[in-house]
């Protein structure tokens, strides 16, 4: 059963055409911690250090995690860039994400934000290696396909193949396409954060795929976006080769 927060995010994004999303704009965010800190606190200092560290550590491999500080003042964080994103664009996205979370979730100890090019998450609680099933939202194209009965199984087939491909890839990332007819293709993406095990990556992706009917039946494009993995399909290419 979906939480009210989950549903509200989905309805908020109902009118969004995915093709028009600006890569520089955040897709969504959650300020998920009820705990706060002050600008001069140890946690605030540790968080600033963590964000600086991630902005230099992540771009070379497209993913990174780190912790700064000790005990209750420890700041834990990770960032993930989409598998096709350049080092320069990854750096820009991670830096922008840290600044934007500071504006949108001021002095909250735990928060997460997504862009087309990256995600960033931090918390005073160690969340590494655990599937994040709480911070999640849907996006879909408002346009419908002509024949959803035949289209929906093809979406599931493509993304299921990409799930199998992604969890076997050290980068936990896969893209691909499926020919629909002589003039059109279906394009897909599956990606996990690399703190997960391979089996947990597949579990996360398969769960995301199973949730597509909640938002995206018969839609020309759709996404299930979470804190540990995301899947996406479109009728146009949306990643760099």
From Swiss-Prot:
Residues 1-23 form the signal peptide. Induction: Accumulates in response to Phytophthora cinnamomi infection; this induction is rapid in resistant cultivars, but delayed in susceptible ones. Keywords: Antibiotic, Antimicrobial, Disulfide bond, Glycoprotein, Plant defense, Repeat, Secreted, Signal. Gene3D superfamilies: Gnk2 domain, C-X8-C-X2-C motif. It is found in: Secreted. Pfam families: Stress-antifung (PF01657). InterPro entries: CRR_secretory_protein (IPR050581), GNK2 (IPR002902), GNK2_sf (IPR038408). Disulfide bonds join 81-90, 93-118, 192-201, 204-229. PROSITE patterns: GNK2 (PS51473). One of its GO terms (biological process) is defense response to bacterium. Glycans are attached at residue 89. GO terms for cellular component: extracellular region. This is Antimicrobial ginkbilobin-2-like protein. It comes from Castanea crenata.
């Amino acid at each position: 059963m979906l939480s009210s927060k989950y549903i509200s995010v989905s309805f908020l994004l109902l009118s969004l055409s995915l093709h028009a999303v600006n890569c520089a704009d955040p897709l969504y965010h959650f300020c998920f911690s009820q705990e706060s800190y002050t600008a001069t606190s140890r946690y605030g200092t540790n968080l600033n250090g963590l964000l600086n560290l991630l902005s230099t550590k992540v771009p070379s491999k497209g993913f990174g995690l780190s912790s700064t500080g000790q005990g209750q003042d420890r700041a834990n964080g990770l960032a993930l860039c989409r598998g096709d994103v350049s080092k320069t664009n990854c750096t820009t996205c991670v830096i922008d994400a840290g600044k934007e979370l500071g504006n949108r979730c001021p002095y909250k100890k735990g928060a997460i934000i997504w862009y087309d090019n990256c995600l960033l998450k931090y918390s005073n609680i160690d969340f590494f290696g655990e599937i994040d099933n709480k911070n999640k939202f849907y996006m879909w194209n408002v346009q419908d396909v002509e024949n959803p009965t035949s289209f929906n199984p093809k979406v599931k087939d493509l993304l299921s193949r990409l799930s199998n491909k992604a969890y076997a890839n050290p980068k936990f990332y896969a893209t691909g396409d499926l020919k629909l007819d002589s003039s059109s293709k279906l394009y897909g993406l599956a990606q996990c954060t690399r703190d997960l095990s391979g089996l947990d990556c597949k579990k996360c992706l398969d769960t995301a795929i199973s949730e597509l009917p909640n938002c995206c039946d018969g839609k020309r494009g759709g996404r299930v976006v979470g804190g540990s993995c995301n899947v996406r399909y479109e009728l146009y290419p949306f990643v760099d080769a």
